[in-house]
Amino acid sequence: MGRAGRIVRGIMVLGSVLLLASCGDSFNDAYCEANNHRNQQTVEHLTNVLEQKRNQPGLYLARARCHYFLGAYAQALQDASEVIRRLPNKADAYLLRAKAGKMLGQIPQALQDYSAAIKFQPTAEAHYGRGLKYLREYQGKDREALEDFTAAIRLDPKHVGAHAFRAQIYSRHEQFQHALADSETVLKLDPTTTNAYCNVGFAHYALGHDAEGRKFLTTCYQKDPDPQTRGYYETEVNKVLYARKPKRNSGGNYVAEGGVKTPYDREMERQQN
């Protein structure tokens, strides 16, 4: 791009920022996006305008968003906090501060900010973000995470991440039919999600659909040849297969895991007698 083109582009960005300033919050944080090559230029112009118009919370929120996408999380948090100071009910500011705080390792504060964002304006993104914090950072919070992922799906049925992590929780608690349904949804929404093939395959095994399970696991290993992936899922499958085998109790009789006799257990006892 020539010098004239750069000048025109700069004028366009500056014009957008000035329009943002004149409209207050109405344009909010719309001028920076992930991987946008103009983000740095936009944040510089926002900073210049803020030197003249410090009474515009919308400009601070816009700059916070730019800082976030540029990886300047401390600055993003600072600008979002300024918006919250001026507009204590601004859900977008709490959500952005939660995301920046998460990247800075401020987990308890991030969790509080996600909750505030949900209180003032429930969104799939806020529920999903809080659900991830419960799942990854806290022990014994699976129920809370599950509720958040379910809320995110209710608000956005096509939220791939919420379906994927809800499937993970269902599988952990041996609710394999639900885990299978969510993992299948992930594949429908995004067939490039490689581990979803493995998750569908394992859920089929857990439900006794071995042939179907093996088909999906084979596809998963073809798409992801990492030996660690195969090792993990084959170990989980072997656990399922081992759990199916009848065990002998102290009296020499066959009994299933947990001490509850199944028709298969009783048949094994009959054959032994």
Feature locations, PLM:
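N-terminal leader/linker segments that initiate helical-solenoid repeat arrays
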Residues: 22-58, 62, 69, 259
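Position-specific recognition of the canonical hydrophobic site in helix A of tetratricopeptide repeat
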Residues: 34, 68, 95, 102, ...
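Structural signature of tandem alpha-helical TPR/SEL1-like repeats
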Residues: 36-44, 71-82, 103-116, 137-151, ...
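Short coil turns that delineate tetratricopeptide repeat
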Residues: 54, 88, 121-122, 157, ...
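Helix-start (N-cap) detector for alpha-helical repeat units in TPR-like alpha-solenoids
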Residues: 57-58, 91-92, 124-126, 160-161, ...
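Canonical tetratricopeptide repeat
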Residues: 62, 96, 129, 165, ...
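Terminal, low-structured helical/coil segments at or just beyond the last alpha-helical repeat
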Residues: 214-273
